[in-house]
Amino acid sequence: MTIDHRSTGGSTTGGSTTGGSTTGRSFGEEGGRLTYGSYLRVPELLAQQIPQVVPPAHDELLFITVHQAYELWFQQLLHELTAVRDAMTTTQLWRARQLLRRAHVIERLLVSQIDVLETMTPQDFLEFRAALAPASGFQSVQFRELEFLSGAKDPGFLARFRSLTPAERRRLDGRLAEPSLWDAYLGLLASRGLPAGDDEQVLAALVEVARDRGRHDDLWQLAEDLLTHDELSGLWRARHVQMVERQIGTKSGTGGSTGAPYLHRRVPMRYYPLLWELRDWL
């Protein structure tokens, strides 16, 4: 007697009986297709943390992991903020606001990551700090891209940073040449018939936006989201310099900068000073 298993809805082969499957394969092994590890390239990812000091220093792995995580999040922020700018350029303000709010969450996460670094004592850091020279956070190309995209364009950085690869220089040149978030916002003001020339005109336009919420509430809300981006960036810089002082005091940076004094000078920088000045006129 021959049994047609297709009619039973089950299995007599010892494999899974769920849904009538007779494959005998485990979850995630459907014919060698994509898996969690292969999709995320986990083996390759975990091979990128390569401590430098001998004998090993326990906290060097933590230091590498945190900074690599920063670079991954910088990549994501560039992805989101570029899309924010493009959405403003095409007057999709709802989309720009949605992605800016996502960027805010990521930026708060970046501030909180400093707490992880501060679990490392100054003595722990000194076990491997000398091996970092002449590398420096100053050399983070993606961090500079974020500043340029946000509106703080500094062509002099390319001259000061002599170890840029050709690909890195092309990326930074591209960010300097393309419109910033602020450029895109000024374009929105102009599209509403508001003056967007010199700073005095822009400030007058912003005052009108703030005072006529009935007509311009979408522009007001978007400006507030840009200001939050500016505020969170400043919060990260302030938190970062505190962490540096806690670790190394006023020593020079590994890349040759003045260290904490240089970082202190960067803290007051604002991407959108006119949005801050606007408060004086409300």
Question: Over which residues does each language-model region extend?
Answer:
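Surface-exposed peri-terminal alpha-helical interaction modules
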Residues: 2-8, 20-282
